[in-house]
Amino acid sequence: MVTKESIEVIAQSIGLSTLSPDVSAALAPDVEYRVREVMQVYHQLQLYFCPLISSLTCRRNLQEAIKCMRHARRTTLMAHDVDSALHFRNLEPTSGSKSMRFKRAPENRDLYFFDDKDVELKNVIEAPLPNAPPDASVFLHWLAIDGIQPSIPQNSPLQAISDLKRSEYKDDGLAARQVLSKDLQIYFDKVTEWALTQSGSTLFRQALASLEIDPGLHPLVPFFTSFIAEEIVKNMDNYPILLALMRLARSLLHNPHVHIEPYLHQLMPSIITCLIAKRLGRRSSDNHWDLRNFTASTVASTCKRFGHVYHNLLPRVTRSLLHTFLDPTKALPQHYGAIQGMVALGLNMVRFLVLPNLGPYLLLLLPEMGLEKQKEEAKRHGAWLVYGALMVAAGRCLYERLKTSETLLSPPTSSVWKTNGKLTSPRQSKRKASSDNLTHQPPLKKIAVGGIIQMSSTQMQMRGTTTVPQQSHTDADARHHNSPSTIAPKTSAAAGTDVDNYLFPLFEYFGESMLMFTPTHELSFFL
């Protein structure tokens, strides 16, 4: 195993160049004996501590390493060949081992040395000093913002999903199954199932309560909004499902912990649909009026909460409601939804949008309330509900104006009492007087984002023979300066005349019913 030449080479490597051949021949058997003793002890320890490792395994590893060496077209076995062999056999490679490149001495073929690179001392002295290691410090950065990891150097990029992993999809094909946890998937499936099949159950009510307060539901917001938008389109003739979807949308909008602003553009059209749609539900017994009332309050709360984030949200909603209210071709349930929506948005909407158009609208509504011209009971019932909504809206506006007005009331030019206590159509003289008053009233107010609301020919016919006077530039500029992002109110000079303009026409339209909305102090004026 150990020859005398090997002893001579080892002696020369440690500086013993005068070793005689006799000494080398005597040392070789002794070194070989001691190496065998060490190998025997190592073999015994290996069998004692690692009985699973045998010489056959070592031989196979060596064979694999030789294969790696030959594939690399080399004749020298290196450390990374052994590492590759262990890797191929699914074993942990060794660490700390490195192959060194030795050069053969030209004078002696059996002598090898490591070729170190010569370095000039001058270059070492003149080399710049390395940078001092920085002090230990802590840096803050965002791991995620609204559930989305920002692309910054501190955050490692997301690893690509392995092709070996299967993506879990349901029949609906939602790609969300890749980003939602198992708990959120089960939660979403259960809530959507209860909304479609068990909307009146206790479980669904508890789920709605959870949606209003749970702070961990932000990953589900885009999927709930998509679900609501899709199911409303599919179930326009199913009243229970529409009501359940509106309750679901309201719970999401009331949750202060979720970031729902980016999804309002997808959610608001569906909500507005449930407010001013022509038909909600299939059966005549479906109480779609309550659904419209519930949706109106949802629209108002949404505009109140997110109006400062999206400045065009309130003008766009108001414009949609006003167009529906002024369109005589729309059905009475649509008018009812538009009126309730504007009432829920605030009394200023009623004052600026509903009251100026109240007289012409009642001229078209009164025939629908009478048995003589309207034979269908359902349409008469709808007309009376619209009439009641207008009366409540006008009464609330009247009450607030009387409470805040500091001007003295001027006496009416005609009697404001109805003699028989029943709703009757105004006389022709009153119609003419009402039309004359409308010519002096301000036009529809300007919405800052939407601009002047243009009226179609059918809407102009709804006003009868009245015409809208042109606004002066001074008046329009003053209103636009006072309120840049909402419907422009009247100027302070004309604010005091609103009571005189609308008070007595309201008593003519609704009779003694307005007394319910008159404050006690102002009521003495009529007694």
UniProtKB/Swiss-Prot annotation:
Q: Which Gene3D superfamilies match?
A: Histone, subunit A, TAF6, C-terminal HEAT repeat domain
Q: Where is the composition biased (Polar residues)?
A: 416-427, 462-473
- Cellular component GO terms held in the UniProt record: SAGA complex; SLIK (SAGA-like) complex; transcription factor TFIID complex
**Every Histone-fold domain range:** 3-99
Q: Which SMART domains match?
A: TAF (SM00803)
What does UniProt give as the signal peptide span? none
Provide the free-text tissue specificity comment from this protein's UniProt record.
Expressed in roots, leaves, inflorescences and siliques.
Entries under InterPro entries matching the protein = ARM-type_fold, Histone-fold, TAF6, TAF6_C, TAF6_C_sf, TAF_TATA-bd_Histone-like_dom
Any one Gene Ontology MF annotation carried by this entry is: protein heterodimerization activity
**Region (Disordered): which ranges?**
410-442, 462-492
Keywords of the record, alphabetical order, are: Activator, Nucleus, Transcription, Transcription regulation
One Gene Ontology term of the biological-process aspect is: transcription initiation at RNA polymerase II promoter
This protein's superkingdom? Eukaryota
Q: Where in the cell is it found?
A: Nucleus
Q: Name one Pfam family in it.
A: TAF6_C
Q: What is the annotated quaternary arrangement, including any partners?
A: Component of the TFIID complex. TFIID is composed of TATA binding protein (TBP) and a number of TBP-associated factors (TAFs) whose MWs range from 14-217 kDa. Interacts with TAF5 and TAF9.
What does the record give as the function of this protein? TAFs are components of the transcription factor IID (TFIID) complex that is essential for mediating regulation of RNA polymerase transcription. Not redundant with TAF6.
Q: Which family does it belong to?
A: Belongs to the TAF6 family.
Name of the protein described by the UniProt record = Transcription initiation factor TFIID subunit 6b
- Species of provenance: Arabidopsis thaliana (Mouse-ear cress)
